[in-house]
Amino acid sequence: MDETVYLYKGEVFYFKDSPLKFDESYSYYPDGALVVCRGKIIEAGAYENIKERYPEAFVTDYSGKLLMPGLIDSHIHYPQSEMIGMYGKQLLDWLNEYTYPTEEAFGDSEYAGRVARFFVNELFRNGTTACMAYATVHKESVNALFSVASEYNMQMLTGKVLMNRNAPQSLMDTEESGEADS
């Protein structure tokens, strides 16, 4: 695994406790730094206090930009990665025209794996380090997502979606098939 140390300079803001505790709940460094190694944040704080400890770090300067590490998405659908922004007049139109046809492909392990890798990389690229993600009715989709998340040591809750009505037959489960595949 890559042992390069990355130092990101900018305005660093993160929560360390419940936001209900107001002033005690966060840390803010107007001239801050995040230090990352092997995909993990190993230190955050004032740039002046950190920079000398990492002389070999690859530095990216985001001065004037807000850096917020460790976002958590508590409701996201990984199978919808390829249809972000698709228009639908109503939810049912959108499900029938885009969602269901897209989700039918997730029975293919190779396809599910490609989308899972894209999905996890997009989460990280946007600062999300943990999530609760919906998969599809296909066990292959769940296995692919767990596999990629594990490879990156990402904290994730996910599981097989169970559908037994209001969807195409190819996406439906019975109680027995849902239990067998879970």
Positions of the model-derived regions?
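Metal-coordinating catalytic core of metallo-dependent amide/deamination hydrolases
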Residues: 140-182
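N-terminal metal-binding scaffold of metallo-dependent hydrolase/deaminase domains
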Residues: 1-53, 65
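Structural motif
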Residues: 5, 58, 129-130, 155-157
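Divalent metal-binding segments
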Residues: 90-141
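Hydrophobic faces of well-ordered beta-strands that scaffold small-molecule active sites
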Residues: 72-74, 131-133, 156-160
